Amino acid sequence: MSAVIMQQGDLLLNLYIQPKASRDQIVGLHGDELKVAITAPPIDGKANAHLSKYLAKAFKVPKSDVHILKGELGRHKQVRINAPKSVPAEISALLE
């Protein structure tokens, strides 16, 4: 399993989420997953909403193009980003 997969123009990310971090950032690889730190707490879906907003901004897509496929209630998530307009350097390095 790879942390980042390009599939028919969409990006599939296997993520490990660190909630309540000091700032939002893509940290790097964490085993077979990409570690993402977010400032939101894991309460009442706030972390998922914040993650979607952060990823939408990072990939320059609308929030409606960011889909959490697996892991709604856990730290391990699988996320699909429909037709990303931009790919952050940390992630494009993993695609090569």
UniProtKB/Swiss-Prot annotation:
GO terms for cellular component: cytoplasm. InterPro entries: DUF167 (IPR003746), YggU-like_sf (IPR036591). SMART domains: DUF167. It comes from the Bacteria. Disulfide bonds: none annotated. Signal peptide: none annotated. Belongs to the UPF0235 family. This is UPF0235 protein SO_3356.
